[in-house]
Amino acid sequence: VFIAGDAAHLMPPFMGQGMCAGIRDVSNLSWKIIHCVKKTHNEKILNSFQKERFSNVKEYIETTMKMGEFINAMRSYKISNTISDQSNGSKTMKSIKPELGPGLGSTLDKNRGRIFPKFNISKSKSFDELFSFEPILIVSKKLKLKKMSNKIKIVKESSYKELTKILKKFNADAILVRPDRFILQTF
């Protein structure tokens, strides 16, 4: 039995992240369950769910609680470390992008567990929509791949100009992206 979303963690309402966290929970679980049903992965892969999602959701909950303090105008000194001054004098909250906790992939890879950037490939379609719930391997122009498994989609850097920037951002020649769009490994 797996518990996901608000059944697993009650999210304060201030950032609208309760349903988002639930969707990320289900996204994390669904591709793993699909592979277990198809017998392409051992059921032990499901053990990574709680480890991976805990720290990610925890950071959202903590930030949402700080946002609640801000919204409720509680003592401003409590939240001063989460607010930054802008050049125009306005104040903004720092954005968060929590990584997955330990689970699948090498924890020695500093990019493992980070969310893969989203970008549009046309006015009406995003890169994510092209590869729904499929693992993808993004490879740079430098790499010459021979035959790979047909279970993973290979996307060449030259296919989309945005991939050049992304490979550079992660200092990688290849990025293995999980079906839930978190980075499994960079090479």
Could you describe each region identified by the protein language model?
Residues H35-F187:
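Helical substrate-recognition/capping region of FAD-dependent monooxygenase/halogenase enzymes
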Residues V1-N47:
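Active-site-proximal cofactor/substrate-binding loop regions of enzyme domains
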